[in-house]
Amino acid sequence: MTEDRFEDLGAERRAEIGDQLAERDRTHPEVRRPEVPRPGNKYAWAVGIVAIMGLSVLLFAETLPNKGKGLFGLKPGRVIPAFAAPNALGNAEGDPNICQRASRCNKTIGTVPACSIVAPEVVNSCQLRRKPLVLTFIFDRGADCYPQVDRTERVRPSVPGVTFATVFFTNKKRDQARAIVRDRGWRQPVALDDKGITDLYGVGVCPTTVFARAGGRVVTTRLGNLTEDQIRHLAHRIER
């Protein structure tokens, strides 16, 4: 038989004690011990950040003009390829000519070699590479690349022996592109590109800056923004 510890008490007394205990349970509930936290992965936050960064790179990559394996520009030692393209401030129309030699010319890349197209309203890389050259590539989407050209403009007067030029890959109307160049005060030649030059040079990062010695041989290709001091230092380097 189960022992009742209140069996010696009367019914009323047992009821009274029961009520008192119930009231005590209500006013003094048992303190619950906090749950022990489950062991977590201390690197989980890092995995999350990497995943977000990967998504950002993927989204940015979708805006790049050049998605092939040549994403980082020309390697040192290469001679910059020939192109002839409309100057943003001129009235020349048409797509850039990127034909490297007569035997390979066609309607897609140009019916004559690019080097043969020389005119005041045309930006011709064969003319540019006669002197040390700083050639900047910018896009009008994906990132704000325009300030890089602003910086090259401020550096340009301090290295008069170096030519500065820009390739502007844009889908804007001609008047819009011309307005950008004028409003920002760019005095260096700005070649308008429809993607052909950018792909030819293997550019997929905005901005990309190519530094080449006289004759067009590349010394270095730099990805991303550069300070004025960096631009000036590299410009002096290609003079030697």
Residues covered by each model-derived region:
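Hydrophobic membrane-insertion alpha-helices, especially the h-region
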Residues: 44-62
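Structural microenvironment flanking redox-active thiols in thiol-disulfide oxidoreductases
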Residues: 131-184, 196-199
